[in-house]
């Protein structure tokens, strides 16, 4: 039988199961005497996104900042110890690496430069009643996180997402385009 060729610019179908498995939980413990413990707490939870086959996980930095213990929570609930690889003060991103194999496929990377106001996206978290939510980019503008970083072109989306810390911002074709940080009122 004949098949019609799909145009080059048509996005590939999204495998939501694959995306959901690439978004994991991050649990950290921070000593009470650290600079950030009072404001951010000593037990922090967030999301992380598997970005390579060696257990490298991208998250938002405040989840891991000053942590002395890090666990990655897999989709099946199993906790895998991890080590902090780095924290980028320019972007506010953090990286951790699993000590044991995760045996999970990494997410495909996209280009956040392709996002502009009006674009539809998905926000994906590790947990919650609704781990996936449709959203829309409302603007790209500067963001000053006085405690951490300054972004020239932060991505602002609506509606607000309850499990935002380290959540994956997914674009057309199922590619990672951003990492959730916080909810702002404007």
Where are these regions (language model features)?
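Conserved hydrophobic positions within beta-strands
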Residues: 48-50, 82-84, 137-139, 169
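N-terminal activation segment of mature serine protease catalytic domains
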Residues: 2-49, 53-62, 69, 116-121
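C-terminal cap/linker of serine protease catalytic domains
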Residues: 3-16, 104, 123, 129-133, ...
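Conserved active-site neighborhood of the chymotrypsin/trypsin-like protease fold
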Residues: 31-33, 52-132, 154, 159, ...
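Active-site region of chymotrypsin-like
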Residues: 22, 26-37, 41, 99-106, ...
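Short secondary-structure boundary/capping segments
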Residues: 15-16, 85-86, 147
């Amino acid at each position: 039988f004949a098949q019609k060729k799909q145009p080059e610019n048509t996005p590939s179908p999204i495998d939501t199961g694959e995306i959901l498995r690439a978004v994991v939980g991050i649990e950290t413990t921070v000593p009470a005497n650290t600079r950030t413990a009072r404001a951010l707490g000593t037990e922090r939870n967030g999301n992380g996104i598997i970005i390579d086959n060696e257990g490298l996980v991208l998250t938002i930095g405040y989840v891991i900042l000053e942590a002395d213990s890090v666990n990655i929570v897999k989709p099946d609930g199993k906790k895998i110890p991890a080590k902090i690889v780095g924290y980028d003060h320019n972007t506010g991103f953090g990286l951790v690496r699993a000590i044991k194999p995760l045996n999970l496929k990494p997410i495909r990377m996209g280009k956040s430069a392709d996002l502009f106001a009006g674009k539809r996206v998905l926000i994906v978290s590790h947990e919650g009643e609704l781990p996936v939510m449709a959203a829309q980019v409302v603007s790209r503008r500067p963001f000053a996180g006085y405690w951490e970083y300054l972004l020239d072109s932060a991505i602002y989306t609506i509606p607000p997402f309850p499990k935002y810390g380290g959540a994956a911002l997914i674009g057309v074709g199922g590619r990672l385009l951003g990492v959730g940080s916080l909810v702002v009122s404007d």
